Amino acid sequence: MGTDTPNTETRALRDGLFNRLPDADAACPYGECEGDGWITDEATKTARPCKCQKQRASARRTRGLTREIPERYRHIGLDSPEVEELAARAPAQVRSARRYAETIDDQLDKGTGLGFHGDPGTGKTMLAFMITRSAIEAGRTVAVYSFPRLLAAIRDSYRDDATDGYGAFLDKLVDVDLLQLDDLGAERPTEWAAEQIFLIIDGRYEAKRSVVYTTNLALPGGEGGSEETLAERIGPRVMSRLGEMAPPVPLFGADQRSHLAPDLP
């Protein structure tokens, strides 16, 4: 997969945000146990599981997935100037994204996500990475793939020298707390590729795992800047699952104010 030797940007991020991800050999990210996943009470001579146990186990299972945030978006947070500027143009959309990020643990525990539909340059990728950063800072496991890169990674998993075989790689993609998919539908998948995407999305749907995605394609009803809808590009089965998992947040140019974004609980 090529993740064993991270580039400079990836190393820098792992030294920063990613050192907060729970690991089997790391100290407790919550500071509640000694790093072994158990909270002991010397007075009663008892022990109870630490909440980091579940995240440590997930971190082990999802090692090897791509999870770096690109340099362009690494500084993006809830109150970044770029987010504030976007909020002036698309208040409902930014409010939905912020609400999701502020309640990241609850959202991931429920398996809810968001889908950002919009023209290039409207801020959808920025909001997606704002959410992913919140998940990382909360100690949750994440995987970040562009649609073309994900398809390439699936093909690579068939190679004899692959770090993870096909089955193991798909299991990791299903198991990670948050899967961010950028440019979903950027290329028309073959029948084989469409089936792989369905297996991933359906697996996450059944496991109540969150998906945050971005796409330049129109909403299911045809609303948006592109002639083709996301459902037409990736297929009705995948779109049906995503529709339940990740409510669409439209960001289409000058018409942003006229759209309604989902109001998360």
Q: Where do the language-model regions lie?
A:
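Pre-Walker A (pre-P-loop) alpha-helix and adjacent loop at the N terminus of AAA/AAA+ ATPase modules
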Residues: E82-L114
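Loop/turn-to-beta-strand initiation segments
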Residues: R140-T141, D175-L178, A207-Y213
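Interdomain "pre-motor" coupling segment immediately N-terminal to P-loop NTPase/helicase cores
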Residues: C28-E71
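P-loop NTPase Walker A phosphate-binding motif
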Residues: T125-R140
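Walker A/P-loop nucleotide-binding motif
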Residues: D106-A128
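Short glycine-rich substrate-engagement loop in P-loop NTPases that contacts/grips substrate
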Residues: R89-R95, I136-D175
